[in-house]
């Protein structure tokens, strides 16, 4: 698929404008306000969606708020990153010991748990946008992947491209978790669909209602992509 250069914030803004309010679990644009605790607090607890930030300093602040939400039962799970590159842990309430959340290390086998995991990858100063998908018995086809994949390369550094990527990483419960950016993981165990779109540089965080269908998300992403490309064409 051809590579195009797109401004991350413009893409997020275009995507946000297309999402019906009824489908938005959380809506936040962090271009001016970069307070991770505020971001974390704005995530709708009832939707049980987690925040991932690609900035380790902000992530540490947000992690405290989210961990508190897990411990108090507001949130079902949360994700942590270490250096804006890899998710190292998943915290869920520990049913055997409610005072201590259960830690699952990155790469652990998941069994009979509805957990959404996605990887953030930082390269050459820029980051990825990612659509994570926990799906019920879904066939993730190359067509769907292509529909949801938008690569942004830095033309000034073709040998060491700086990029933002929108990709889909599909996995279900009892699937092995893989950290490579291009890895596609599929499984057959049941899990309710949940979607999270986020900007790891806090250009924008959009958490979609987990009831949205894959086709709806694919359409939104495609329309937003076309909107940005059309705008770029008009400016040329």
Q: Model-found features: residue ranges?
A:
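DNA polymerase processivity clamps
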Residues: 1-236
């Amino acid at each position: 698929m051809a590579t195009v250069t797109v401004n991350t914030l413009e893409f997020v803004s275009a995507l946000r404008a297309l999402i019906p309010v009824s489908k938005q679990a959380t809506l936040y644009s962090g271009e001016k306000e970069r307070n991770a605790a505020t971001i974390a607090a704005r995530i709708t607890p009832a939707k049980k969606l987690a925040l991932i930030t690609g900035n380790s300093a902000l992530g540490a602040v947000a992690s405290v708020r989210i961990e508190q939400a897990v411990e108090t039962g507001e949130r079902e799970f949360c994700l942590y990153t270490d250096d804006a590159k890899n998710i190292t842990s998943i915290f869920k309430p520990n049913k055997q010991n409610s005072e201590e959340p259960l830690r699952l290390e990155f790469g652990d086998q998941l069994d009979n748990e509805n957990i959404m995991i996605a990887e953030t990858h930082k390269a050459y100063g820029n980051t990825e946008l990612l659509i994570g998908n926990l799906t019920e018995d879904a066939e993730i086809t190359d067509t769907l992947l292509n529909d949801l994949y938008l690569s942004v390369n830095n033309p000034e550094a073709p040998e060491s491209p700086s990029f933002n990527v929108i990709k889909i990483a599909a996995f279900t419960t009892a699937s092995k978790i893989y950290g490579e950016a291009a890895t596609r993981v599929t499984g057959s165990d049941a899990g309710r669909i949940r979607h999270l779109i986020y900007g790891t540089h806090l250009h924008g965080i959009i958490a979609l209602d987990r009831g949205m269908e894959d086709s709806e998300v694919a359409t939104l992403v495609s329309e937003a992509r076309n909107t940005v490309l059309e705008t770029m064409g008009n400016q040329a």
